[in-house]
Amino acid sequence: MDLVKGAAKVARAMVACMAMLACMGIVPAHAQRVDPDIRVLRALLEKAEPEIDLARAKLVIDQLIDPTIDIEGTLAKLDVMAAAVRASAGPRAKSSEIAQVLRSYLYDAGPWNNRQPFRFDLEGDPLGHKIAGKLLTNYLATKKGNCVSMPTLFVLLAQRLGLEATFAASPNHYFVKYRDETGRWYNLETTSGGHPRRDESYQRDTPMTPQALKNGIYMRPLSKKESVATVMVDVLLDHYKDAGKPEKVIAIADLALEHYPSDIDAMLDKGYAYYLLIRDFQNKYPMPRDIPPEERQRFRALERNNRLWYEKAEALGWREPDAGADARYMEMLKSVKSN
């Protein structure tokens, strides 16, 4: 009986100790309650590359933002779209011919789409700031997209058609990388009808450092796992930034970086999350001298982490956009849309 009481006392002490450590942020990951979103994302990211279904991954992540999303129904809709492209291309079509039919199916007006093609939302949300505009189901419903939703649909359909297509990034922008039957890679700009664009064009319109190119954070085709970690998870990170949940942002960014260590978006989101925590601290204590002694260590840790993650991004070649970056980006989008 004394042993049972002793064990119970030890257990209570351990629980109290773990609670204290949790408050300090140093509880081992396995000892903490696993956040449901983290559990879902980890299951996706721990799949072997050939087992990753990008369409399902996208919808599972989007459903964390909008629980009303019908995953199976949307997958069935994608299958119907892919079947229509395959039938139009014919049984003996080469990869490049199927890609051209897919491009026309999505972006040219015709009876196959009731003369309502998918188009870039130049007037409504051209910079892709609205979370809803990045959800696949919203894009399918409205046919108005941005540089997240538009390449996403193209890649998901291309992969269902057996084409070698994936995502690539330039600063604040995603596009499609496609390799044809000859082994040649093309950049396809879905915001302007899926037409090819040269590397030099992206490097001119969305400037990137030689260091960034050397480190592969821009312009290269992403693996499926990298695509999930950055293109798809980044929408969830934006959702939690908008919701004012920086701790959640940090936890999700950590998971993304675990599987894609060069994920610039996750680094920047993590740095921004620490800024939000610093801002909350400063709202509570307007002057540094107002911070109680027992909380100063945490405040300094927040400042260090805020600097750390921006410095990590800069070390890979990322640079802070200047004041005119958004205006130049808009001009680029208008230019490619008119070509």
What are these language model-derived features?
Residues 2, 19-20, 40:
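Acidic/proline-rich low-complexity IDRs
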Residues 13-25:
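Bacterial N-terminal signal peptides
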